[in-house]
Amino acid sequence: MRSVKVSDYMTDYVMTFTADTDLFQAIGTMLERKISGAPVLDKEGNVIGILSEWDCLKRILHGSYYEEVGGTVGDYMQTEVLTISPNDDIVDVADNITKKGWRRSIPVMDNGKLVGILSCPDILKVIYDFDEHTGEGAHGRA
C-alpha cells in the first residue's frame, strides 16, 4: 500500500470537551453528532484526556451498580492519550494501534496544538479507497 498521510484522512473539525463538562451532556453531544469520543482539553487548549463511548458505558454500568451514576468528563476520561502527527503514515499508525490495542480516536497534534482527529473508520476508508483505485484486495476483485 502506498504511503498515505494522516492529514489526508483526518477530521479537521474536532468536537472537544473540558474536564468539568457534565458526563450526560457529553454523552448527549456524542450521540447527537454521531461520534464515538472526543479529546478533553484544559483551559490552555492542551489535550489532557480522551472520552470514548466505551469509557462512558463501562463507568456508567459500574456506577449504576453502586448507585453513583453521573459526574463530569474528568471523572471518566482516559488520561493516557496516544497522539499522532498530520505527517505520520496511516498504515504505520494502524499497525501501532492494533499492536497496542488502542480502540479510541486519536488526536492529531501539530506543534503541540490539536489540529484534527483520526478514527478507525478514517483508517478503514484508506483501505477501501486504496482497494477501489487499484483493483487490489477483496473490494476490487470480481
Protein language model regions, located:
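A generic helix-loop boundary/linker signal
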Residues: T16, D20, N46, Y66-E67, ...
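Short hydrophobic/aromatic-rich motifs at helix boundaries and adjacent loops
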Residues: Y9, Q25-G28, E44-N46, S64-E67
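Tandem CBS (Bateman) regulatory domains
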Residues: M1-Y13, S52-T83, N87-K100, L114, ...
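The conserved cystathionine-beta-synthase
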Residues: F17-K34, L41, T83-W102, V108-M109, ...
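A glycine-centered beta-loop-beta connector
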Residues: M30, A38-W54, I97, I106-D122
